[in-house]
Amino acid sequence: MENPVIIYVISDAIGETAQHIIRAVTAQFSLNKPADIRRHAFIRDESALLETLEEAKAADGIVVQTLVQAKLAEYATNFCVQNNIPNVDLLHTLTAAVEAKTGLKSKQDPGNMRRLDSNYFDRIAAIEFAVKYDDCKDPRGLLDADIVLVGVSRTSKTPLSSFLANQNWKVANVPLVPEIPIPAELFQIPAERIIGLTTTPEKLAQIRKVRLKSIGLDEASSYSSEKRILEELEYGYDTFKKLGCQVIHVEDKAIEETAALITEIITSYH
C-alpha cells in the first residue's frame, strides 16, 4: 500500500507502552512508508475518547488502546466493533488473567504507573548524571558511575548512556583519542564496571562520513580515512586490554540490543 498505516494510540496515561510495542511490531514488516503513529494521551472521559475514536474512523486507522479504566476500554472496544475498526486492547486480557489468578481486582488507576516514587527520582538523577558526565566532561564522575562506556568517536557512547540512564543506571563515558591521555580515574575503578565499545573499520568509516556530511564538512577528512580509523581502533583495543574490561561490537546492533548486553554483563558481576 502507498499510504502509511495509521495507528491511533489511545491511553489514559502517557501511551509509551503501546508506542514501544507498535514500533517492535511494525519493524517486522517491509512497509513502503513508516507507520503513522498518532498518540492520544490522558484520555480520561468518554467525550474525549469518542472524539479520538471518530478521528481514527475517519482516517481508516488501527486503534491500539492502553486504557486502564475498564469502562473506557469497553466503550472503545464496542465503538471499534460497531464501526469495523481494527482494535487491540493491550491491557485488559492480561489484567483479567492476573485477576483470575490472584483473586484480586485491578485498581484501575491510570496514574498508578507514573507515581512520583523513589524510582522516578532515581531515574531523573541518572539522566542528569549522564548529561553531566557525557564525553568525560569531568573525570571525577567516573568514580561514582555504575557503568563507564569507553570507545572511539561514533561508537554510540552518548545514546547508550542516555538509554541506560532511563533504566536508572548512572553512566559516564570516555572518548578514546590517541593524542589525548586516558584519565587516571579510569584505572581507579573496577574493570567490571567498564565496557569497551568498538566496531568494524568499514562501519565506522560509513558512520563518520555521514556525520561529516551532516555538518557540512568534507567526507574525505582524515576523521573518516582508513588510516586514521585503523589507528584509533587499534588504540582502542590496546586501551581495553590495559583496563581489562569487557568489549562489545556495536556494528549492526540497535541501541536497545547493545544496552541489554551491557546490563547483562554488569549484573553478572553482582
Curated annotation (Swiss-Prot):
Report the protein's function.
Answer: Bifunctional serine/threonine kinase and phosphorylase involved in the regulation of the pyruvate, phosphate dikinase (PPDK) by catalyzing its phosphorylation/dephosphorylation.
User: NCBIfam families, alphabetically?
Assistant: PRK05339.1 (NF003742)
Q: What is its EC number?
A: 2.7.11.32, 2.7.4.27
- Any one Gene Ontology molecular-function term assigned to this protein's record: phosphotransferase activity, phosphate group as acceptor
Q: What is this protein called?
A: Putative pyruvate, phosphate dikinase regulatory protein 2
Instruction: Specify the domain of life of the species encoding this protein.
Output: Bacteria
Q: Which Pfam families match?
A: Kinase-PPPase
Similarity annotation: Belongs to the pyruvate, phosphate/water dikinase regulatory protein family. PDRP subfamily.
EC category name: transferase
According to the UniProt entry, the coiled-coil residues are none
Keywords, in A-Z order: Kinase, Nucleotide-binding, Serine/threonine-protein kinase, Transferase
Name the species this protein comes from: Listeria monocytogenes serotype 4b (strain F2365)
- Name the positions where ADP binds: 151-158
